[in-house]
């Protein structure tokens, strides 16, 4: 399944890059107006994005909820033995809605195309057999009870609308829009409001934009600062 997804993304991205030069990025001294990338490097970055997310969620698993409102200091050991990713996914698969939700959305794109209606994404995860929490779970409940997006993610119907759910699963939006942060934001506008609104949604828009910009810049500071332009200054 993952090989199929990566192949779909590679083809879609390669096609998208043909029009990447037509999308105007906000003029700065840091980003090019047009950018060319080889198919080999494009695929390498796509694979790196998925691998990085998978490694990250496994690495962060043992520390979740243990350092609230604080940075994890360098002297704190975090165990990351060989085979730990496999063990996490085998023995605690329910931890990784970050990954499952991403792949669910990509599967819908693969099956129905880039213009797939938002209801298709909503039904796909609402009827999936993996567990969910907070805004995702509330959105699932809403959808199964007839409250469809964007109302399913609105704070009037979803008490977790400001949570980080879409932020942890917005990676796909940037991975599917290389060098096109505005297009990543359009995808987030459609899918992110299934479960979030307000700051809960802005976080996902920002993450998607950073992924998108990482295709055309290897400077972390540039990626971080440019992606901020996709969300309100005071969000």
Indicate residue ranges for each PLM-predicted region:
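Sec-dependent N-terminal signal peptides
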Residues: 5-14
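C-terminal motif of bacterial Sec signal peptides marking the signal peptidase cleavage site
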Residues: 16-19
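N-terminal secretory signal peptides that target proteins for export/translocation
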Residues: 1-2
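Structured, active/binding-site neighborhoods that engage oxygen-rich ligands
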Residues: 22-235
């Amino acid at each position: 399944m993952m090989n199929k997804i990566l192949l779909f993304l590679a083809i879609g991205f390669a096609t998208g890059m043909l029009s990447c030069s037509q999308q105007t990025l906000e003029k700065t001294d840091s980003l090019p107006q047009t950018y060319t990338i080889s198919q080999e490097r494009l695929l390498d970055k796509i694979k790196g994005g998925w691998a990085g997310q998978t490694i990250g969620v496994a690495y962060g698993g043992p520390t979740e909820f243990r350092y609230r409102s604080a940075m994890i200091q360098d002297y704190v050991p975090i165990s990351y033995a060989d085979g730990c990713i496999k063990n996490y996914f085998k023995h605690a698969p329910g931890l990784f809605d970050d990954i499952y939700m991403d792949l669910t959305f990509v599967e819908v794109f693969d099956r129905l195309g880039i213009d797939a209606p938002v209801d298709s994404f909503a039904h796909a995860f609402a009827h999936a057999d993996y567990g969910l929490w907070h805004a995702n779970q509330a959105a699932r409940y809403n959808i199964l009870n007839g409250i469809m997006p964007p109302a399913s993610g609105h704070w009037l119907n979803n008490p977790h609308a400001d949570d980080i759910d879409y932020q942890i699963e917005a990676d796909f939006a940037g991975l599917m829009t290389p060098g096109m942060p505005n297009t990543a934001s359009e995808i987030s506008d459609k899918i992110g409001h299934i479960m979030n609104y307000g700051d809960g949604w802005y976080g996902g828009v920002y993450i998607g934009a950073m992924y998108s910009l990482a295709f055309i810049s290897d400077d972390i500071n540039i990626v971080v600062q440019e992606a901020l332009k996709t969300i309100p200054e005071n969000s």
